[in-house]
Curated annotation (Swiss-Prot):
It catalyses: Co-precorrin-5B + S-adenosyl-L-methionine = Co-precorrin-6A + S-adenosyl-L-homocysteine. Pathway: Cofactor biosynthesis; adenosylcobalamin biosynthesis; cob(II)yrinate a,c-diamide from sirohydrochlorin (anaerobic route): step 6/10. Its EC number is 2.1.1.195. SUPFAM superfamilies: CbiD-like (SSF111342). It comes from Syntrophotalea carbinolica (strain DSM 2380 / NBRC 103641 / GraBd1). Keywords: Cobalamin biosynthesis, Methyltransferase, S-adenosyl-L-methionine, Transferase. GO terms for biological process: anaerobic cobalamin biosynthetic process; methylation. This is Cobalt-precorrin-5B C(1)-methyltransferase. InterPro entries: CbiD (IPR002748), CbiD_sf (IPR036074). NCBIfam families: cbiD. It is an enzyme of class 2 (transferase).
Length: 350
């Protein structure tokens, strides 16, 4: 988004802190700023929060600055403790950094949630100072609380936040970051043995999935507004069956060809839903500015008819986008989570 200020990832902050700690370990003086190489081939200088020597090593810290991005870790203190090791370079999770417990992520279970990109940045940064064997422990004091506001609990990352970053830079409201999180969720579901996933737009759909069906947390994967991306991702690793569940205010856009359902990038489905309701119900439909309002003015029998018809159109659209690589069922709900209609075989989730 134009005019928004970028920032640095937790991985870049960890690399800067680790470099300063490694420098102290090797007898160098404290610097107010730490210059590090980023994964995009550029360099940046990050301000130091503090640094001091320890009896067996050194510790340094950098405050995370995510710029204008609504990152939950913005302002968090990223701490690196560095001690000598008989291994070339090893990573440990300190306070507030999670441990991976499920397969399907970039690192195996048991490893600290310090992603491959940040590990490369940390290695490049400390190797500018020394070739000695080092143990680098990353800590984020508020990480355990911050992690509750992320996907980490669902991804099986326990005890804290992840140290992330593919380039070292934070791009405000990055679509790439959103999609990466969704991809991780689906990969974890597959690696956990989920064969009947449920795609939902968000929390309303997730709550309804648990209310109406027998599903585990891993089965339910949020697609947000990125339905084209998610269906294409599912097509790469087809499940035994797929359930798409959510509110028709978003999902009725898919049969219209709007696979990015964000309101600023897709047309309102209200006119087409009203036109469909008028045609199949053979009666006037009240004016409304929302799909929820269209359904609210119908009788229970009419709601079921319209809901099932929209669910059928949704099933056809998703099946076509999926290239018919898996059976698709669909279910539509209102904002209260009540069922409006469905299509396809729902027994795998019952």
């Amino acid at each position: 988004m134009a005019g928004l200020q970028g920032g640095f990832t937790t991985g870049a902050c960890a690399a800067a802190a680790a470099k300063m700690a490694a420098a102290l370990l090797c007898g160098e003086a404290i610097s107010e700023r730490i210059s590090i190489p980023l994964l995009d081939g550029t360099r940046e200088s990050l301000p130091l929060a503090y640094a001091h020597r320890l009896p067996d090593g050194a510790e340094a810290a950098v405050y995370k600055n995510a710029g204008d991005d609504p990152d939950v870790t913005n302002g968090a203190l990223i701490i690196a403790r560095v001690v000598a090791s008989d291994k070339p370079l090893e990573f440990r999770a300190g306070e507030g950094v999670g441990i991976i417990t499920k397969p399907g992520l970039a690192l195996p279970p048991g490893e600290p949630a310090i992603n491959p990109g940040p590990r490369l940045m940390i290695e490049s940064a400390v190797r500018e100072v020394t070739d000695r064997g080092l143990r680098v422990t990353i800590a984020i004091p508020d990480g355990k609380q911050l992690a509750e506001r992320t996907f980490n609990p669902r991804l099986g990352i326990k005890g804290g936040i992840s140290v992330l970053g593919t380039t070292g830079r934070v791009r405000p409201f990055s679509l790439e970051a959103v999609r990466k999180t969704m991809e991780c969720s689906y990969n974890v579901a597959c690696a956990s043995g989920v064969r009947h996933p449920v795609l939902v737009p968000g929390h309303i759909g997730e709550r309804a999935a648990h209310r109406h069906f027998q599903v585990t947390q891993e089965q339910v994967v949020e697609a947000g507004n990125e339905w084209g991306f998610m269906i294409d991702l599912v097509a790469q690793t087809p499940p035994s069956a797929l359930l798409v569940l959510g509110h028709p205010g978003k999902l009725a856009k898919l049969p219209l060809g709007h696979w990015d359902t964000h309101s600023s990038r897709s047309a309102s489905p209200v006119p087409s839903v009203r036109e469909l309701a008028t045609r199949i119900l053979e009666c006037p439909v009240a004016e409304s500015t929302t799909v929820e309002g269209v359904f609210a003015d119908l009788t229970a029998e009419q709601r079921q008819c319209l809901g099932d018809t929209l669910a059928r159109a949704l099933q056809i659209a998703v099946s076509h986008r999926l290239d018919h690589r898996a059976p698709v069922a669909t279910a539509l709900i209102n904002l209260a989570g009540d069922m409006l209609g469905s299509c396809g075989d729902l027994t795998p989730w019952q």
